[in-house]
């Protein structure tokens, strides 16, 4: 049976803006209050999805969240009509208001953790939405994320959906941004790597001091238990706390894995040798490539600024691997020089493809942030909601949908306009019909 890794990218929502909400994410903070282009951002995302589909990859799309989140504002004491709620919140609590307008769900690497059927005890693909407790604006997402995932992967014969972990910092979970999987073939049993930033219940362990560690060891363990993973195919690795304090807020900012390759910066992990020995032992026979980038080749600052590791590492139809990189990598001399050399080395990585995702990059998210990876066999793939799969016709429909509903320019001040709320709801209501999702948003269930 054929096996695939399918990338599901998040559609950028109509309220895409630069509010600088993500403390610990340097790019997000640096671009706070800049004017955004929701239309351009959505089209950049769609163009990347289509480009991967044209490369022969199987590509899906996940719907965005409904924003502004008026229900969240009502829970916090704002009342009256939707227009009154928006105006009150924007005036009385602007930071909270902006958090309730975030389009951050476009970064679907944080949507959930996914374990393929080859790894799980019951032979199903398992999904656990991330609770994203560390950032208020993202903690609003898990319930609707779960709705969207259930509507996309609806067949209970093949897909198992869990509730997100408790909404508490002790179980802070950031999803696939801190999870990767190494395997020989996508349909074979692999080794799942869970990367965490701190221990919630043991303060004697190393932890960052400046920026928060968003993923806990205890959360990673819980997800592995929920998914029915065996100890024989799970490795827990602590991210280097010093890197978190320098702006490496998720592990996918400093490493990326695919099949038998782990591409990483030498400073990425604690106890690297011990962790890699465990990976090798659990991976078993076969070539396994640990591609280490040393500081002399690419400084930590250049790696973070360019998002060298927040790239997608994909396997092409001919078996060679390609790095899907933001144009920021091409524009950085040290990073560009390294990548040009990398494709000539004796590793599976033979191609670099650059794509413009600057609207996302300015908010602190590169190509890898924009996608959720789901490994499936052909039977499971056939059971996915086919209206969420990218092809020429759906690409055209979604582009037309963006043209019809999205604004060219959006400032933070525009977010209080009830017309934007109504535009967004109209757009998303139409999108759920395009993607055949049913009613996944609270405003559709009134």
UniProtKB/Swiss-Prot annotation:
User: Know the name of this protein?
Assistant: N-succinylarginine dihydrolase
Q: What class of enzyme is it?
A: hydrolase
Extract the Gene3D superfamilies matched here.
Succinylarginine dihydrolase
Q: Which domain of life is it from?
A: Bacteria
Task: Give yes or no: UniProt keyword Thylakoid.
Answer: no
One biological process term in Gene Ontology: arginine catabolic process to succinate
| Organism, scientific name | Pseudoalteromonas atlantica (strain T6c / ATCC BAA-1087)
Give the residues the record marks as binding substrate: 19-28, 110, 137-138, 214, 252, 363
């Amino acid at each position: 049976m054929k096996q695939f890794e399918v990338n599901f990218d998040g559609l950028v929502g109509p309220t895409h803006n630069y509010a600088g909400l993500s403390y610990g994410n340097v790019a997000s903070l640096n671009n706070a209050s800049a004017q955004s282009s929701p239309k351009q951002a959505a089209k950049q995302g769609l163009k990347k999805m289509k480009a991967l589909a044209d490369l022969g990859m199987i590509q899906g799309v996940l719907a965005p969240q409904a924003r502004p989140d008026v229900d969240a504002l009502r829970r916090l004491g704002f009342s009256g009509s939707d227009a009154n709620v928006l105006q009150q919140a924007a005036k009385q609590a602007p930071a909270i208001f902006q958090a309730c307008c975030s389009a951050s769900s476009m970064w679907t690497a944080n949507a959930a953790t996914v374990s393929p059927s080859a790894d799980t005890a019951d032979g199903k693909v398992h999904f656990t939405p991330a609770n994203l407790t560390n950032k208020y604006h993202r903690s609003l997402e898990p319930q609707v994320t779960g709705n969207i995932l259930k509507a996309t992967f609806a067949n209970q014969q093949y897909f198992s959906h869990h509730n997100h972990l408790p909404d508490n910092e002790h179980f802070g979970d950031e999803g696939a941004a801190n999870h990767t999987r190494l395997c020989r073939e996508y349909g074979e049993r692999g080794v799942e790597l869970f990367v965490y930033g701190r221990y919630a219940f043991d303060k004697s362990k190393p932890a960052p001091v400046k920026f928060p560690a968003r993923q806990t060891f205890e959360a990673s363990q819980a997800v592995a238990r929920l998914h029915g993973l065996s100890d024989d195919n799970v490795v827990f690795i602590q991210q280097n706390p010093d890197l978190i304090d320098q702006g490496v807020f998720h592990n996918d900012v400093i490493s990326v894995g695919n099949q038998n390759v782990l591409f990483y910066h030498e400073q990425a992990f604690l106890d690297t040798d011990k962790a890699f020995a465990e990976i090798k032992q659990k991976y078993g026979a076969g070539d396994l490539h640990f591609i280490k980038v040393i500081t002399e080749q690419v400084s930590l600052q250049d790696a973070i600024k360019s998002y060298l590791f927040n790239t997608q590492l994909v396997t092409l139809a001919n078996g060679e691997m390609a790095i899907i990189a933001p144009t920021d990598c091409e524009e950085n001399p040290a990073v560009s020089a390294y990548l040009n050399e990398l494709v000539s080395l004796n590793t599976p990585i033979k191609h670099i493809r650059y794509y413009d995702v600057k609207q996302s990059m300015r908010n602190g998210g590169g190509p890898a942030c924009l996608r959720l990876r789901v490994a499936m066999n052909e039977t499971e793939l056939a059971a996915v909601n086919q209206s969420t799969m990218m092809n020429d016709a759906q690409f055209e429909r979604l582009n037309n949908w963006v043209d019809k509903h999205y604004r060219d320019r959006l400032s933070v001040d525009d977010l209080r306009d009830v017309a934007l709320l109504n535009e967004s709801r109209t757009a998303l209501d139409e999108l759920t019909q395009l993607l055949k999702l049913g009613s996944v948003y609270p405003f559709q269930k009134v």
